[in-house]
Design a protein with these regions (language model features):
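Class I S-adenosyl-L-methionine-dependent methyltransferase catalytic core
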Residues: 1-189
Length: 189
């Protein structure tokens, strides 16, 4: 029996209404359309000039949405080889440019990237942090992500519990949709 394939719709930009597919995988729950719409209203419809990191890429909905809206580049990190394969296939179908997909552990990738992020050109303007639902990975990722940010960078956080400011993190915007809490946060001064 073939593995089940799921779809998520890109809601804005160049690829508006295009669908990307992804396999079933434990903990993989793409951000709902209305949550993504709110997020990109917060970030702005045009992401030109921005470098983005989708650290727990999963379906790729957030990273593909950012590229569709003009982001200069997107780096997607996903641990599952099957899900990585789907991300690469979708990138090919969309003829996505300026996208790199890394099949790696997100925390290890962030740690290694922080070591090479001394140069601001290696840092990110927007980071999407939507780890597997109800995992403790968000708390582990936040300190690592703080080292990957350009001045003024924004981080989108999605989780089963409301985000709490502290340790240099400040909430800019916050919302809730069903069981999901989502926030746009900044780090540092």
């Amino acid at each position: 029996m073939a593995a089940k394939s799921n779809q998520v719709r890109i809601i804005g930009g160049e690829w508006r209404s295009r669908r990307v597919t992804f396999p079933d995988h434990e903990g993989l729950r793409p951000s709902a359309d209305r949550v993504r719409e709110t997020l990109f209203n917060w970030l702005g419809q045009d992401l030109s000039g921005l470098r983005c990191l989708d650290l727990f890429a999963g379906s790729g909905a957030l990273g593909f949405e950012a590229l569709s809206r003009g982001a200069d580049s997107v780096v997607m990190v996903e641990k599952s080889p099957r899900v990585c394969e789907a991300l690469r296939r979708n990138a090919g179908l969309l003829a996505a440019k300026n996208l790199s997909v890394h099949c790696a552990d997100a925390l290890e990738f962030a740690t290694a990237s922080a070591a090479s992020a001394a140069d601001a050109t290696a840092r990110f303007d927007v980071v999407f942090l939507d780890p597997p639902f109800r995992s403790d990975l968000l708390l582990q990722a936040l300190p690592k992500v703080g080292k990957l940010l350009r001045p003024g960078a924004q981080v989108y956080v999605e989780s089963a519990a409301a985000f709490v400011s502290g340790n240099g993190w400040r909430i800019k915007r916050q919302g809730r949709a069903g069981q999901v809490y989502y926030s746009l946060v900044t780090y540092g001064d």
